[in-house]
Design a protein with these regions (language model features):
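Small beta-barrel nucleic-acid-binding modules, primarily SNase/OB-fold domains
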Residues: 2-151
Length: 151
């Protein structure tokens, strides 16, 4: 029993809030939010996607779209881990819809090739490209990971 208690204490608190409803959500950019979960404020990075930076073309539109997906909705986080910056990594669900997927499907984020595990996201990205949705309206959109290296 003592071992189990110590094991539980060793887990990062972020991992204990899986499937927890979020409150007081504030959108930082197209792939990052701040929210309260079980009374604790956390910063959340949406996994497997990369949205344009705020100073990049479509950055503001991406942030606004994410805000519309989350505003006054029941939002749940499924934790996938934590990144090197201390952000909780996870999938967001708004009224039971996968927000990470919707960001890609409507052209407001790229599939983050380096970290993508859900191959079905590429189907939605290809569809958004074919339909010239969101950032895919631009002639040659620059992926955020390329943009960051250039700046």
């Amino acid at each position: 029993m003592k071992f189990i208690f110590l094991l539980l204490l060793s887990f990062n608190a972020a991992y204990l809030i899986s499937y927890t409803p979020l409150e007081n959500i504030r959108v930082v950019d197209g792939d990052t939010i701040r929210a309260e979960a079980k009374g604790k404020e956390i910063k959340i990075r949406l996994v497997e996607i990369d949205a344009p930076e705020m100073n990049q073309p479509f950055g503001a539109q991406s942030k606004n779209f994410l805000n519309r997906l989350l505003y006054e909705k029941e939002v749940t986080l499924i934790v996938q881990g934590e990144d090197r910056y201390g952000r909780v990594l996870g999938n967001l669900f708004s009224n039971e819809l996968n927000v990470n997927m919707l960001m890609v499907k409507f052209g407001f984020a790229w599939v983050y090739d380096e970290y993508a595990k859900n191959s079905s996201l590429y189907k939605y990205q290809d569809q958004a490209k074919a339909e010239n949705l969101g950032l895919w309206r631009a002639k040659d959109p620059i992926a955020p990971w390329v943009w960051r290296k250039q700046k």
